[in-house]
């Protein structure tokens, strides 16, 4: 077998990172560029690819909470930094990195008590993210950079808020797109999960999510008050997309639906315009999780027949759909994954990409893929997900349960 040759753009990026070094060996994994053609993702040679992977949680919370100033990853995956080889061993080809806008931008922010805190206490957040993207790239993975936690004004992003904010989120995307536009294997997910509560404008939820609007409260992240009165302007998907494109970035951009990214019913009517035609729709299907999240209604399940039909309509219109989050039950002793065993075969047949939430060693009974730092799959969900990825990597998708 011939030895792999280094990819010129990858080598130049890795060698150019401050404080990051690699041995110059021609054994780098052959990660390719990615772009959108019709309703599929394609690689640098124009071959259709299906993205299958996982999110790694930690970067969105660890630094802003001050858990471990020395390490913004917080060892949430069981080790100080993610073991990219384990993801590849699961036959994954993509990883999603959820970020915190205050930690990336580095401005002092106020918690629910009014006390100021440093969301980048180790002054290492950007360097950590850059190194993580470089390492994942060198391991042969595509990378999604996801704006996960936001907050208006100078409030700390300590919990999910209804939408990106007009001031900080625009600055975030200008900086992030400028930083990573040289990575043709990186995709930008503009905002994790719009839920558009407390609208003060006559706009519909869809208009406010895609074009911006006014919101009258924000989520503090504290037990009391969980939410607080404050009028602020959201950043619409169109404004954030325009900000990314203004940097010269041509990377694919991922656009969520509303209601925690579970509703795609009017996505086609309201999606932002991209002259490059490099956008995809984001859907977060989950099994029933309850009716509230904190004190707010949480409209799940998001995986009913209508949800599949909405996703199919977007595909039929020539636009890709990607599940940047999904999950199933994994409490100890769980056998099988009924939600996943319906969703993933459908996605394979439709050419829809998907990522599991989450590659972390939390001992939660839902939506956790692994038990330990060795990547042992969790009961139920984790076992099924790993087995399914192994099957589709070797066999036609139609042959994989």
Go through each PLM region and give its residues.
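Extracellular glycoside hydrolase catalytic/binding regions
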Residues: 33, 67-77, 160-187, 191-353, ...
């Amino acid at each position: 077998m011939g030895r792999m040759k280094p990819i010129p753009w990858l080598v130049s990026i890795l060698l150019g990172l401050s404080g990051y070094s690699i041995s110059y060996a021609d054994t780098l994994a052959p990660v390719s560029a990615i772009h959108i053609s019709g309703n599929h993702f394609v690689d640098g040679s124009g071959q259709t690819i299906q993205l299958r992977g996982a999110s790694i949680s930690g970067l969105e919370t660890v630094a802003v909470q001050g858990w471990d100033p020395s390490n913004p990853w917080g060892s949430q995956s069981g080790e100080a930094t993610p073991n990219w080889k384990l993801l590849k061993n699961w036959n994954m080809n993509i990883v999603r990195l959820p970020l915190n806008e205050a930690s990336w931008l580095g401005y002092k922010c106020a918690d629910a008590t009014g006390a100021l805190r440093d969301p980048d206490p180790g002054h290492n957040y950007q360097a950590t993210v850059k190194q993580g993207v470089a390492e994942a790239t060198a391991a042969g993975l595509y990378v999604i950079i996801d704006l996960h936690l936001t907050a208006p004004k100078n409030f700390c992003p300590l919990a999910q808020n209804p939408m990106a904010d007009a001031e900080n989120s625009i600055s975030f995307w200008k900086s992030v797109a400028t930083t990573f536009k040289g990575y043709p294997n990186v995709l930008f997910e503009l905002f994790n999960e719009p839920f558009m509560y407390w609208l003060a404008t006559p706009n519909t939820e869809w208009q406010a999510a895609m074009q911006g609007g006014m919101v009258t409260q924000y989520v503090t992240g504290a037990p009391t008050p969980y939410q607080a009165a404050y009028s602020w302007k959201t950043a619409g998907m169109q404004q954030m997309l325009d900000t990314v494109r203004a940097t010269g970035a041509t990377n694919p951009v991922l656009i969520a639906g509303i209601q925690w990214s579970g509703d795609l019913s009017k996505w086609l009517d309201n999606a932002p315009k991209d002259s490059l035609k490099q956008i995809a729709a984001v859907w977060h299907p989950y099994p029933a999780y309850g009716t509230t999240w904190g004190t707010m209604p949480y409209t799940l399940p998001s995986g009913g027949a209508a949800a599949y039909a909405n996703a199919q309509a977007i595909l039929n219109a020539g636009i890709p759909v990607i599940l940047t989050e999904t999950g199933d039950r994994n409490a100890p002793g769980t056998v099988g994954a009924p939600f996943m065993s319906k969703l993933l075969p459908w996605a394979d047949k439709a050419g829809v990409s998907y990522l599991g939430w989450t590659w972390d060693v939390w001992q939660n009974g839902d939506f956790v893929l692994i038990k330990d730092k060795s990547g042992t799959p969790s009961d139920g969900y984790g076992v099924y997900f790993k087995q399914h990825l192994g099957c589709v990597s070797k066999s036609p998708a139609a042959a994989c349960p």
